[in-house]
Amino acid sequence: IRDGKDLPAKYSYAQGAMDSLNAKQGRKLCEEKLGLTADLEPCGFFDDNVWFRGIVDLVIVDDDVAWVVDYKTGKSAKYADKGQLELMALTVFAHFPNVQTVKAALLFVVCTAIVKGTYHRASNSTLWEKWLSKYAKMQSAADNDVWNPRTSGLCRRHCAVLECVHNGRN
């Protein structure tokens, strides 16, 4: 989209999705680097006071609506992280004050799947409460150097922490 060219032949399976995005009205920003301060104010990605950073693969801003797309190369959308969509939407709301609705998507270009989410500026405070609560728990763990083990689907075969009680290779 950035260069206005067709995809190389080996990626032709994703050309339809790219054409659809390219046809949308609005200002298209590719690999947009966005930052937020600890007060959740917009700032530059490399600013000294940056607290949160995100890079959005594609943002299309058209008046009060923005489309946000993150391209994924995974073979399955089964474990897609919709939280990434929420954080991208919150960051776009901060940087583009006229935007009232963000239509976000994780576009899995290999398996041709798409995971969508729609977010409204009116829901900002609820979403920020969720994410700031998660951050507070991580900050507390870092401050106290206490990292309680939690089981996940990766423990059995993929965890590198052999001393963890949940590691399946013990």
What are these regions (language model features)?
Residues 1-68, 76, 83, 97-105:
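Catalytic cores of nuclease domains that cleave nucleic-acid phosphodiester backbones
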Residues 37-43, 48, 80, 90-170:
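Metal-dependent nuclease catalytic regions and adjoining charged, substrate-binding loops involved
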Residues 85-88:
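Active-site-proximal acidic secondary-structure segment that organizes catalysis
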